[in-house]
Design a protein with these regions (language model features):
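C-terminal membrane-associated helical module and adjoining short loops/tails
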Residues: 127-201
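Structural signal for membrane-spanning alpha-helices in multi-pass inner-membrane proteins
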Residues: 22-29, 85-91, 115-121, 143-147, ...
Length: 201
């Protein structure tokens, strides 16, 4: 008998890591109000997702293991890029209540909806040469960049709407390769570094 535990595979280590980093980001933001740590963890999760496909392809896998890996990646992305930013950003300081809170949660829903819509799109459409709309790891790095400053809870809906639109917009972005890919990775590493320095000093 095949059980879910049999589908645990080392090729998915970076995907599991992204999930763990996202949970840690929630814990640091909600329990400790530490947004430098949350920003570092979000950037690290984005980097883990960026490299998880390359990492997985280094292993010899059966067709089932490849299919499980693809499903796992999509499910984890929904948590890491759809749910985690909402929970982290809701922990930001700011007076709640009234119409503003309704607007906040409506925009959060729109953002989460755009996230899962994008994931569903890429579960069906496979394109190794380009992205349609802004990829979610880049959105996570935008959130991490925002957390470099004392962001107010009240301006988050504007960023939610902008990021949601960017994820599902019908414009084409070539998949970064070479120098472009290195620049993207450097953005993520730089964010982790800056946030960690803020934590120390």
């Amino acid at each position: 008998m095949i059980a879910p535990i049999h589908d645990l595979h080392r090729s998915n280590l970076l995907t599991y890591s992204a999930l763990g980093l996202a949970i840690a980001a929630v814990a640091t933001a909600v329990n400790a109000g530490d947004f430098a740590a949350a920003g570092a963890l979000l950037a690290a999760a984005a980097l883990a997702d960026t490299f998880d496909g390359r990492f997985a392809r280094r292993f010899s896998r059966t067709e089932r293991q490849r299919a499980i890996g693809a499903q796992l990646d999509s499910l984890v992305d929904a948590i890491v890029f759809g749910l985690t930013p909402v929970v982290v950003l809701n922990a930001l300081p700011g007076e709640r209540g009234g119409l503003m809170e309704t607007v906040w949660w409506a925009s959060a829903f729109g953002y989460a909806l755009a996230t899962v819509t994008r994931l569903s799109f890429y579960n069906v459409e496979q394109d190794d040469l380009r992205f349609v709309g802004v990829p979610m790891p880049a959105i996570a790095l935008i959130w991490s960049t925002c957390l470099l400053w004392p962001v107010s809870w009240h301006i988050v809906p504007i960023i939610f709407v902008a990021c949601a639109g960017a994820m599902v917009a019908p414009f084409v972005i070539p998949r970064p390769r070479g120098a472009a890919f290195a620049a993207f990775a450097l953005w993520g590493v730089s964010l982790v570094t800056v946030h960690v320095v803020r934590l120390i000093f």
